[in-house]
Amino acid sequence: MRLYGILTSLPIVKAADEDLKLERRLAAELIKNWRDSYNDALRDMFDLLQENISQDAVKIIEDNLLDALGPAFGNSKAVRGQINKFITEAYSKAKKKFYAEGSLSLADKRAIQVLSRHNCFWLGEHYGKHISPKIAELTQKALDEGLGRDALAKELKQELGGIAPEGYSYWDVVSSSALVRARSFGAISGMEAAGIAEYEILATGDERMCDICGTLSGTHFSVQRTRETIDRVLDITDPEEFKAAMPWQTKAPEVTPETKDKKPIERKVTDDEIVRLTAYGQNLPPFHGRCRCTLVMVNE
């Protein structure tokens, strides 16, 4: 890489490091809250049960655990507060990179609120479904084998602990996806306020870069048209529709015939594909889990 390229990339690398630290902080906070909810749910549940486990007791166990570790967890005050706090920080910093003047506008605050709400919903929805089969299996085993309360408590703690997200593999994707999208929305808000017409996707360019990000890197998109897509998405209230409105990429975008056999980073996305990606909300990171792409302004 030429010296100029190295020097101009340093601020981006430093910013990426700071972004990663923020994502890890959010992941750590969510892990702690999940563990607390898990332990509290077990303790509260077994305080209500008799020694002998009945069919009714099994139903209570299933309902309480699924609620505590699913919807109730995602909607808890602690989790909602953390999600909102970190999304606000990511959004604000991204906006200030392009427009340092003034504070967050009402439109910015609304975007943060919507992003926070949808992230909290899917946090509870996904994990509730993830642990549901295991809870049902363990409680049925308690009935079949005549396990007592303490024995079932031990089984649940041991088995659920095995699928609980102790590491960053699950929470890293959750926190990264939430904050990368917040940064993208914040960056577009800042560019619009600063009068910037176009932005460019910038991939990392290292050995971990995927074909999707490599192909999109260097592609230019309209700030105004992307702003219109964001506004449309923010008006969606149904969580399923919101998720579908800005889906992750499943394959690299269409490229021009003369560049299709080149390395991903050297390919050129077609004009028609740029229009399609913008319309379908697929022109902003994250393009997939743990996406590390960023946005930079295009100098006219």
Question: Where do the model's predicted regions map?
Answer:
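Acidic, glycine-rich two-metal-ion catalytic cores of nucleic acid-processing enzymes
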Residues: 166-300
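N-terminal leader/targeting and assembly helices and adjacent pre-domain segments
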Residues: 1-165, 264-285, 296-300
